[in-house]
């Protein structure tokens, strides 16, 4: 298991409020690591990368289509996308090299998922990643 995968498992899934997580390489637009059982399809990678490439206001208006679900975007800026669909959601944080993706499901606290994902994103940015 790689250092990056350990980070995902320990800092995100370890909270019990992150259902699944992944790191996407921005330059290659490809999956780097993911939590067990979480697959991110190339179309989903494009959706997330384009969510940052577009004007954040446009992303916020249009929402995201991720993992075969429409999500309402509740935050979109240069570094973060938060989107929800009923009792589930996806949090995406942009670093220099990666998109950090975390999902939460029913019964989990979105605020804990957001906080853990943003903290890991800050850590990766400080490390130059």
Curated annotation (Swiss-Prot):
This protein's GO cellular component annotations are: cell cortex
InterPro entries per UniProt? PFN, PFN_euk, PFN_sf
User: Which Gene Ontology terms describe the biological processes this protein takes part in?
Assistant: acrosome assembly; flagellated sperm motility; manchette assembly; sperm flagellum assembly; spermatogenesis
- What SMART domains does its record include? PROF
Q: Please provide the record's keywords in A-Z order.
A: Cytoplasm, Developmental protein, Differentiation, Lipid-binding, Spermatogenesis
Q: Where in the cell is it found?
A: Cytoplasm
Please verify whether the record's keywords include rRNA processing: no
GO MF annotation, one: lipid binding
Domain of life, per lineage: Eukaryota
ATP-binding as a keyword of this entry, yes or no, is no
Q: Which family does it belong to?
A: Belongs to the profilin family.
Q: What does this protein do?
A: Involved in male fertility. Required for manchette development and acrosome biogenesis during spermiogenesis. Binds in vitro to phospholipids, including phosphatidylinositol 3-phosphate (PtdIns(3)P), phosphatidylinositol 4,5-bisphosphate (PtdIns(4,5)P2), phosphatidylinositol 4-phosphate (PtdIns(4)P) and phosphatidic acid (PA). Contrary to other profilin family members, does not bind to actin in vitro.
What name appears for this protein in its UniProt entry?
Profilin-4
Species source reads Bos taurus (Bovine)
């Amino acid at each position: 298991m790689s250092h990056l995968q350990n980070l995902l498992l320990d800092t995100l899934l370890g909270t019990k409020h992150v259902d699944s997580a992944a790191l996407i390489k921005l330059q290659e637009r490809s999956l780097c690591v993911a939590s067990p059982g979480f697959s991110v399809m190339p179309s989903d990678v494009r959706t997330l990368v384009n969510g940052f490439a577009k004007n954040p206001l446009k992303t916020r208006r249009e929402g995201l289509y991720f993992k075969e679900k429409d999500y309402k975007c509740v935050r979109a800026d240069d570094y973060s996308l938060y989107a929800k669909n009923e009792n589930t959601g996806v949090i995406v944080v942009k670093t220099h090299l990666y998109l950090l993706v975390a999902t939460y499901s029913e019964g989990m606290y979105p605020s804990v998922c957001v906080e853990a994902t943003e903290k890991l994103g800050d850590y990766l940015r400080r490390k130059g990643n």
